[in-house]
Amino acid sequence: MIPETRKALIASGKSYIIENVPLSPLINPIRLCGSSFGLKVRRHRLFENNLNLEGSICNHKERPIGVYGSLNDEIPKGGKTAETIGQAREAMGIDWAIWTELVEAIPPAYTKYLGNQIE
């Protein structure tokens, strides 16, 4: 689906950004990490674009809060997912979403960071 989307976006002649996860078939993507924005999640995401945007530098000094799977799950390599919806919301910088939305969400800090580069 990404190649078809890219083709349509390029054909439009307009600026574009395609978001996806690491190892997705994006061309020269930049990477954003929640730790770069003071969030308690890492949530690495890639962004292919034709705008010459800059990625962020990870700051993996603190143990992240997992916002995926189920609440209060053990993580195989150590740690746990968020214990409460409130903790997950705070970790992601999103105060309105339910769990099923949080596990799929892109932190608003990413949108702000990219949007500020476009202005």
Annotated model-derived regions:
Residues M1-E119:
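Class I S-adenosyl-L-methionine
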